[in-house]
Amino acid sequence: MRVSVANHLGEDAGHLALRRDVYSGLQKTPKSLPPKWFYDTVGSELFDQITRLPEYYPTRAEAEILRARSAEVASACRADTLVELGSGTSEKTRMLLDALRHRGSLRRFVPFDVDASVLSATATAIQREYSGVEINAVCGDFEEHLTEIPRGGRRLFVFLGSTIGNLTPGPRAQFLTALAGVMRPGDSLLLGTDLVKDAARLVRAYDDPGGVTAQFNRNVLAVINRELEADFDVDAFQHVARWNSAEERIEMWLRADGRQRVRVGALDLTVDFDAGEEMLTEVSCKFRPQAVGAELAAAGLHRIRWWTDEAGDFGLSLAAK
């Protein structure tokens, strides 16, 4: 069956975006970096380790829901096309593909990601395992290229892993509204959201005793050193995970052990860190069930199903246009 890859990003788009984000973020107060720059090869491997840690429950909880409810998702949405926002070849993706195939409706898979190499790997794996399924991969950015997602058929858009939580309320509303704008009558959205719970348990999920998450957090500095000719002393920053109760979100920071002057050669930029100064590297917003429904409604979507895992740690919403 046909495989196509539509690349809407230039070859140097990722590098240019990194330059913009680092130049802007290092001059803010407090300094900050977007979490997408964690994920080079090393960072992706570290995150895979994180998802298997006993303290990190979200991946297991979401998979538990999908094992129990994928058939219900398939029956409720009656989709023939699975659009995966943030491509992957995980067990969770396969559970949904299998449910649609078992129902007899699966015709097309549309992985959407900013990373062309990830898309290529995804397309190859899915083509091998799901013969007869048309694959239309889209390489693009959520902020610019949602309109490039192929139309036609009944589409199930899937945004899992509580990745939506990396967006603060304003950008999150903009994203959901933009996504609803490209959906057509008959289309559905399956959205994964991590739920508000005991603060100590949340912090443990982002600050494991083995230090894997700390390595993952510091890796963003190694990425900048390599890609932008910077000289961060990576080991002179400590990982900090903190629950912000007012905003109901986990925040990850990097705290400088001592004063440090950093030169970013590719940007002709020099920045100073004071001892104890913290730089924000990720927010992970947590959600309450009613609030998720309200945010979907504000974007023009109607939630038709709501599921949680047995412990009530994680929620999946199925919403329709």
Swiss-Prot record:
UniProt similarity note: Belongs to the methyltransferase superfamily. EgtD family.
Positions contributing to L-histidine binding: 56, 166, 206, 282-284
GO annotation, cellular component aspect: plasma membrane
Biological or metabolic pathway of the protein: Amino-acid biosynthesis; ergothioneine biosynthesis
Function: Catalyzes the SAM-dependent triple methylation of the alpha-amino group of histidine to form hercynine, a step in the biosynthesis pathway of ergothioneine.
Catalysis: reaction(s): L-histidine + 3 S-adenosyl-L-methionine = hercynine + 3 S-adenosyl-L-homocysteine + 3 H(+)
Keyword NAD included in the entry's annotation: no
UniProt KW keywords: Methyltransferase, S-adenosyl-L-methionine, Transferase
Protein name: Histidine N-alpha-methyltransferase
Binding-site residues for S-adenosyl-L-methionine, renumbered to this chain: 86, 92, 113, 141-142
Family annotation (HAMAP family): EgtD
Top-level taxonomic group: Bacteria
